[in-house]
Amino acid sequence: MDSKSGRSESAINIPESNSTKHKSTVVHTATKVAAVAPRGGGWRRGVSIFDFILRICALAAALAATATMGTTDQTLPFFTQFFQFQASYDDLPAFTFFVVANGIASGYLVLSLPFSIATIVRPHAAAIKLLLIIFDTVMVAFTAAAAAAAAAIVYLAHNGNSKTNWFAICQQFNDFCQRVSGAVVASFVAAVILIFLVVLSAVAIRKH
């Protein structure tokens, strides 16, 4: 009888209980969630890093526009006993507003850098991104308005207006016109980057 029991092998199948199945399902689900979560955070962190780089570029453009326009001054080498031919940015209110607006935008961009770093550390912080969107939009209005007003004056300086007897001055004040034209271009670049920052933050919040 012992030999028969040794020859035959019996397999005992222990059915898996419902609690064990439930635990294994929970473990698999938690593993999938843990695998997906870093991906979403990594994507948002990448967007935040790109946001930080764009802010530095916008800051450089706004500072260049402010410094270039604020230091623009040219005096012609010839003068009379009563007149000296000079052109300065503060002779025109549009250029003065240009310097003030781009200076404010530069200061804001400097202050926004720590908040941009905070979104890199905490990529799921939607409140910070919403705050940046609001102020970025205000700075877009400032820089775009200043650049547009200055561009109108630069156009008149280059081409004049025969109907109002406004003569083009860029043939005489060549250096002055080149500097103010470069400042206007830099301001438009800053405005475009700020617009892109608003769109980028809005997309990140929408996919939050």
From Swiss-Prot:
Keywords: Cell membrane, Cell wall biogenesis/degradation, Membrane, Transmembrane, Transmembrane helix. Its main location: membrane. Residues 1-23 are annotated as: Disordered. One of its GO terms (cellular component) is plasma membrane. InterPro entries: CASP/CASPL (IPR006459), CASP_dom (IPR006702), CASPL (IPR044173). The chain crosses the membrane at residues 47-67, 97-117, 130-150, 185-205. Belongs to the Casparian strip membrane proteins (CASP) family. This is Casparian strip membrane protein 2. It comes from Triphysaria pusilla (Dwarf owl's-clover).
